[in-house]
């Protein structure tokens, strides 16, 4: 039986099905004009110069990491062995592309209120070895980018932004995902927009954009403009140029259907975010002082991917009992992203160090969970939480 209050619901209507039929009737299924139009619309919406669509948010993280290894700009270029600071609480594929490219991960603790970086711990973790910072805006909540910029810019630290859970969030009027040199987004079913599967990388750097266009499709030059920052001027012989490989690339291309659906979803995005924020306002007003659990403190304007609940430490409650209580009440729930990822079994394969104790991340891992937010009103769900 389906839960009364699921983690995610569809935001599709007839417009998305019509878009799918439009692609089917065209007979063009692999990446083409629909994807290009989606990329242009997405870049304009978030205020970035360039957007590259891929087949998942995980692929978006892979692509943006890889691009920084091939840039000719020494201020942005990463190399194997470089140290990158990462938050202890995030999703698996925030981290795996970094280790696959040979970076050394330094895990830093999370703030119990915002669920983003503990800024004091972050500042103390930065050293002369620190080359890059991975910023994750968790569950729709922006980081304090004023502080992050003050910590990174004077030191020449490259900022990457995993914004897969936070499309539509803003800090000081600027869209999250656009603060870093590169930023990733996801359009998986449960996210703010859904293209079935999908992801996007944005950047203002033209060379990185061209590198990503090549890496996305086999490392070839076929999708590059004639005059580009990667190869200079392309040759006029399409027979040769269509099969010219210049980078060790992948196949991360999205389907044309994903681009077509994405175009329709972007038209709805303002109302989708507005609906989530209305629910978020009620969540804060009804649950901010709940005696049993703590909720996430908003920074800037969150786009409220989901609603976190952290059992208060002085109550001594069991999360397992709380989950059973939520399940009986009709809630589908899950861990806060992947919990403290530094405690995962996969860490034996990852070159890393841990800064400090990660005490907050451990607490989130053992006492935290989240329930779903949606674009439609969910007053009964929030009132049911308030009554617990």
Question: Model features per residue range: what roles?
Answer:
Residues 161-195, 210, 241-244:
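Conserved active-site segment immediately N-terminal to the catalytic lysine
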Residues 35-40, 48-51, 57-58, 120, ...:
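PLP-dependent aminotransferase class I/II
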Residues 28, 32-83, 97-101, 107-109, ...:
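Phosphate-binding glycine-rich loop
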Residues 185-186, 199-205, 234:
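Short beta-strand-to-turn element immediately C-terminal to the catalytic PLP-Schiff-base lysine
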Residues 85, 106, 159-160, 184, ...:
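Structural detector of well-ordered beta-strand residues that form the stable sheet scaffold
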Residues 1-28, 33, 244-246, 372:
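N-terminal "arm"/small-domain region of PLP-dependent enzymes with the aminotransferase-like
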Residues 70-163, 170:
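PLP-dependent aminotransferase-like
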Residues 195-199, 262:
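Adenylate-forming
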